[in-house]
Curated annotation (Swiss-Prot):
It comes from Aeromonas hydrophila. This is PTS system cellobiose-specific EIIB component. Keywords: Cytoplasm, Kinase, Phosphoprotein, Phosphotransferase system, Sugar transport, Transferase, Transport. It catalyses: D-cellobiose(out) + N(pros)-phospho-L-histidyl-[protein] = 6-phospho-beta-D-glucosyl-(1->4)-D-glucose(in) + L-histidyl-[protein]. Residues 3-88 form the PTS EIIB type-3 domain. Gene3D superfamilies: 3.40.50.2300. The modification Phosphocysteine is found at residue 10.
């Protein structure tokens, strides 16, 4: 089975890096076939083309319409602020 690509985009990176690590650990634990990576928001239009799912950190939620426009047909969602803050 081909792995799905989940790409997270944010402005700072530290919290997102922690979240990516936890997501990768859970995917491995439950044998979920995904590749998860994080990038700065400046690469959303470029890197997002290769993603199956694009997640945005809450600090760049204001960019949702712009990124959706750059990635027509791609699912783009903002990570819930509470879950993001808990790195859960």
């Amino acid at each position: 089975m081909e792995k799905k690509r989940i790409y997270l985009f944010c402005s700072a990176g530290m919290s997102t890096s922690l979240l990516v690590s936890k997501m990768k650990a859970q995917a491995e634990k439950y044998d979920v076939p995904v590749l998860i990576d994080a990038y700065p928001e400046t690469l959303a239009g470029e890197k997002g083309q290769d993603a199956d799912l694009v997640l945005l950190g809450p600090q760049i939620a204001y960019m949702l319409p712009e990124i959706q426009q750059q990635l027509p047909g791609k699912p783009v969602e903002v990570i819930d602020t509470l879950l993001y803050g808990k790195v859960d």
